[in-house]
Amino acid sequence: MENSQAKEQQDGVSGVPQSRLKIPAAIFTEYPVSRVWDIVEKVRVGMLTTQFSGGLRARPLEARVDRDAGVIWFVTDVRGAKDDEIGVAHDIGLAFCDDGAHVYLSITGRAFVIRDSGKAKDIWKKTDDAWFPEGSSDPNVRLLRIEPDTAELWDGPSSAAIIVFDCAKSRAA
């Protein structure tokens, strides 16, 4: 068993075993994690997919990147279903698309619902006022902390390649 695990890791790119991804190794390329953050910051709104008892559910949210911590933050409402869904199943998916530049980004990772009025104030944007007229101190404000594990990137109009790398490694570095 150890030999097959070692072989799987050896064959994988950025610590992601090929056998799990089921994508030929020839299409993998390393990209700097900064490219992921650049795309998220430019696109801003991503589709967050969570799990619930009936399957998957996606909704748009405005992202805030914390490059130093290697995480993505979202401001959310405690009254929404996503907080309950994340409380049960932390695994999530994020999708960002810049159609004009032909850039498509898919991120998988883990999400955590956090109540932290200080952090909410730090990352608050004017657009959040539309959802929370009382501002960052609104008692319904919650934060989603997304810890990305893997990012897949289709970058540019002629890109047939999927660029995969391990965000968790960059967070630990």
What are the language-model segments listed below?
Residues 31-33, 79-82, 125-129:
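Charged, amphipathic alpha-helical segments
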Residues 37-53, 91-96:
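A short, Trp-centered hydrophobic/proline-enriched beta-strand micro-motif
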